[in-house]
Curated annotation (Swiss-Prot):
Residues 64-239 form the Helicase ATP-binding domain. This is Probable helicase CHR10. GO terms for biological process: chromatin remodeling; DNA repair. ATP binds at D77, Q78, M79, G80, L81, G82, K83, T84. Residues 381-548 form the Helicase C-terminal domain. Its EC number is 3.6.4.-. Belongs to the SNF2/RAD54 helicase family. Its main location: nucleus. One of its GO terms (molecular function) is hydrolase activity. It comes from Arabidopsis thaliana (Mouse-ear cress). SMART domains: DEXDc, HELICc. Pfam families: Helicase_C, SNF2-rel_dom.
């Protein structure tokens, strides 16, 4: 054998580490084999539910591992297999069979805390559970209650609960308290949160918390690489699995795909790792359970629909690349900046989703209309899909990665008058649970929202906030408008509908923009899923080389002719083709035999649907030379476009200089007279001048934000710890109102109504005026942080005429925009955040006005890079 063909030598320390793991696995499996095969009767330790065979087997496995002193991972194939019931049945065993007094700790996402409490109360009613969530004051009250209980109770039962249920974030915030409790068992639900061994959460739980016995529940032990697998196994058994370097040295080839080892050695490595994992991990896949007859689920059909970009999207897509041209040229010559590259990818993905994700793209005035749908190829296809799904009586889970995309989709739902629920990271736990209950309430007579508004047609969910733990089997269709970076997250999200309790054929539709960065992400997702299957599944398949970051960005660009990008007819989508596509996609649920093959469709000018079961391939022909050729074309097109804009702007400058001078002279004279009167009476205006909008606004910038919160906007200290401006609308009557914001601002400081009255007295109260009133520390009765500057911005946006039938007018949108611009500019100058009630609902305005207001908020938060908080007022029960 030649030197080149000889397999590399494996270091002895690596062999020793691997053999040690194999020996530990052998000991565990041998002892486990000696246990009785008689399944436990869960009713004997207080479980009221009838468990399915695979659930009984899971509880039995947990019991055996506990008795052997082994901490384990329970992987339930993207969930949906009753993991909560198995976990609480096991806790009931510990409490009532083993006699452990507790306490037991359960960590899980906020969105599923209600589900855990509900199942504990229903199926293990003898277990006392405490849901330790809420704001810091609520949790402080719970801690005081625990302390009082401990003082009064005997040593036999010193805590008022058996199970404490809380979230990962609260575990970190309240670690000083929670880490002092000697937990007799801990369950980490959705344990993929522990995939990063360098994270604060990982190390705090491992080093600070008293949790010697642990169970990790996950549907995705491997999401990106073997480091994540080691992190979970090391968290369970730190002494057994040693260091990360040892683990990677022993099993690195299983994650590399092309390892340099011969095939036989490669297979042996897979075999060894799978054997070791078998002692510490129980993997329950739906496919195996269905094949064995232990689980019956309705069919699942998965489709990928390749959607083209419309003309506006192409313009934005290429303009992003044009803007990033210097960085891309640096990449093509070998340089790279990972952070910069990621930012470009994010902007390209936004262009694929919807152009209105970029400030300044939506045409003004901001009004609901078909322009919202026509601006995005994805939304055009989604529109046709939802129309047919609604008419057919189906219900839909609509997943998006970005919450800003959900904002646009929500506007679309309002435009089409579809009933919907929404769940994202900003929704409080109580509202989440209510939304899930509302959506899950089925009716027997279809989904006509006008007949029964309690049953939403669509449940819109941000993948990261609601993609795990929820039970939404009321839906039989799942649509992914955007794909998560991690394919396992989308797989988990799909299980919200395709799980135990589902009785309908489930259709999953993945919308992917063809010939774009999204298609590259799709391909890489397939490779990540293959890695997971290789290590903990049954097959092994060599993976291909990575396409490279530059090729990912410029994938498909050779199909974009820069000279035709501005020609809308060159890529005009025919509604007949889209309609035909939607018809076939929706009908496929009835027309095809269920199988595991993922089908892929694309819109095509000659053939509306093209089935393509092969993976999306990276463009091997796109080398540096062809890319640079495209760049030169793009530069030429950019220069041509710029010249046209200069000519167009030049033609618009046709103003009368003489007229402007006359107006300016009259204004100056009136201003001097007014200031003289004010000076004589000691009045100083608090009105803010018109801001000068910056010329270099980056329309693709993510700076600034609009946040929706619950609470009182006149007490912003609970949300923000920075200087704050409270924004409130008034009329021009000079009469300070009563109730609502008027009373709240008067209570905050008498300075506010006084300043308003003074402005009216000196005729300084006009529509579009914004008066910025400083709240002195002595006057501020609510602000608990005396050192934090606070202002009130009184926006004059309504006229008042006593002779009108309704004296006070509705809010004037142009005047509101002027006030918002001034307030945002002032906030930017003072490094402050902006706080306001939900404008547009106060005076009974319709939904379309709020659509306009929300767009204006996003516009000026982006221009002046300020944070705006919109408050939903929670009324007392």
């Amino acid at each position: 054998m030649s030197k080149e063909s000889s397999p590399p030598k494996v270091p002895s320390t690596t062999m020793e580490y691997e053999r040690r793991l194999e020996a530990a696995a052998e000991i565990i499996l041998e002892k486990e084999a000696k246990f009785s095969n008689t399944p436990p009767d869960c009713s004997e330790f207080g479980v009221t539910a009838t468990l399915k065979p695979h659930q009984v087997e899971g509880v039995s496995w947990l019991i055996q591992k506990y008795l052997l002193g082994v901490n384990v991972v329970l992987e339930l194939d993207q969930m949906g297999l009753g993991k909560t019931l198995q976990a609480i049945s096991f806790l009931s065993y510990l409490k009532f069979r083993q006699g452990l007094p507790g306490p037991f700790l359960v960590l899980c996402p906020l969105s599923v805390t209600d589900g855990w409490v509900s199942e504990i109360n229903r199926f293990t009613p003898n277990l006392e559970v405490l849901r330790y969530v809420g704001d810091k004051y609520c949790r402080l009250d719970m801690r005081k209650s625990m302390y009082d209980h401990v003082k009064k109770s005997s040593k036999g039962h010193f805590l008022p609960f058996d199970v404490l249920l809380t979230t990962y974030d609260i575990a970190l915030v309240d670690q000083d308290f929670l880490s002092q409790i000697p937990w007799q068992y801990a369950i980490i639900d959705e344990a993929q949160r522990l995939k990063n061994p360098n994270s604060v959460l990982y190390n705090v739980l491992l080093e600070q918390f008293l949790i010697p016995r642990r169970l990790l529940i996950t549907g995705t032990p491997i999401q990106n690489n073997l480091t994540e697998l080691w992190a979970l196994m090391h968290f369970c058994m730190p002494l057994v699995f040693g260091t990360l370097d040892q683990f990677l040295s022993a099993f690195k080839e299983t994650g590399d795909g092309l390892s340099g080892l011969d095939v036989s050695n490669d297979k042996e490595t897979y075999k060894s790792l799978k054997f070791i994992l078998g002692a510490f991990m129980l993997r329950r896949t739906k496919s195996l359970l269905i094949e064995s007859g232990n689980l019956v689920l309705p069919p699942l059909t998965e489709l990928t629909v390749m959607v083209p970009l419309v003309s506006l999207q192409k313009k934005i897509y290429t303009s992003i690349l044009r803007k990033e041209l210097p960085g891309l040229l640096e990449l093509s010559s070998g340089g790279s900046n990972h952070t910069s590259l990621q930012n470009i990818v994010i902007q390209l993905r936004k262009a694929c989703s919807h152009p209105y994700l970029f400030p300044g793209i939506e045409p003004e005035p901001f009004e609901e209309g078909e322009h919202l749908v026509q601006a995005s190829g994805k939304l055009l296809v989604l529109d046709q899909l939802l129309k047919r799904l609604h008419d057919s009586g189906h219900r839909v889970l609509l997943f998006s990665q970005m919450t800003s995309t959900l904002d646009i989709l929500q506007d679309f739902m309002e435009l089409r008058r579809y009933s919907y629920e929404r769940l994202d990271g900003s929704v409080r736990a109580e509202e989440r649970f209510a939304a899930i209950k509302n959506f899950s309430a089925k009716t027997e007579r279809g989904l006509d929202s006008e007949v029964d508004g309690s049953n939403a047609f669509v449940f819109m969910i941000s993948t990261r906030a609601g993609g795990v733990g929820l039970n939404l089997v009321a839906a039989d269709t799942v649509i992914f408008y955007e794909q998560d970076w991690n394919p396992q997250v989308d797989k988990q999200a799909l299980q919200r509908a395709h799980r135990i309790g589902q009785i309908s054929h489930v259709l999953s539709i993945n919308l992917v923009t063809e010939h774009s960065v999204e298609e590259v992400i799709l391909r890489r997702a397939e490779r990540k899923l293959q890695l997971s299957h290789n290590v903990v599944g049954d097959n092994m398949e060599e993976k291909e080389e990575d396409g490279g970051d530059l090729r990912s960005l410029v994938f498909g660009l050779q199909r974009f002719d820069p000279e035709e990008i501005h020609n809308e007819e060159s890529d005009n989508l025919k509604m007949v083709e889209i309609s035909s596509l939607a018809e076939k996609v929706v009908a496929i649920r009835q027309n095809v035999e269920p199988d595991k093959e993922e089908r892929r469709f694309e819109i095509n000018s000659s053939d509306t649907l093209l089935g393509n079961t092969s993976s999306a391939s990276l463009d091997s022909e796109l080398d540096e030379a062809s890319y640079l050729s495209w760049v030169e074309k793009l530069k030429e097109a950019a220069r041509s476009s710029k010249d046209e804009k200069i000519i167009e702007l030049g033609n618009r400058k046709n103003l009368s200089e003489e007229r402007n001078l006359r107006i300016e002279a009259a204004r100056k004279k009136a201003e001097e007279k007014k200031l003289a009167t004010w000076g004589a009476h000691g009045y100083q205006s608090l009105s803010v001048e018109e801001p000068i909008l910056p010329d270099d606004v980056d329309s693709s910038s993510d700076a600034g934000s609009v946040n929706f919160v619950f609470g009182d906007c006149t007490n912003p200290s609970t949300v923000s710890h920075e200087p704050a401006i409270i924004f409130s609308c008034v009329d021009d009557s000079g009469n300070w109102g009563r109730g609502g914001m008027f009373d709240a601002l008067s209570k905050l400081s008498n300075t506010v109504p006084t300043a308003y009255h003074r402005a009216s007295e000196f005729k300084d109260l006009h529509l579009g005026d914004l008066h910025l009133i400083k709240i002195d520390d002595n006057d501020d009765q609510q602000n608990t942080q005396a050192s934090k500057p606070l202002w009130v911005a009184v926006a004059v946006t309504q006229s008042y005429n006593s002779r009108r039938k309704v004296p006070r007018s509705s809010i004037s949108i142009p005047d509101l925009e002027s006030c918002l611009a001034k307030a945002s500019f002032s906030a930017s100058q003072k490094s402050a955040s902006l706080h306001m009630p939900r404008i547009g609902y106060q005076d009974g305005s319709d939904r379309s006005q709020w659509y306009t207001v929300e767009r204006l908020l996003r516009k000026y938060s982006s221009i002046f890079t300020v944070k705006i908080f919109v408050y939903y007022y929670r009324r007392s029960p």
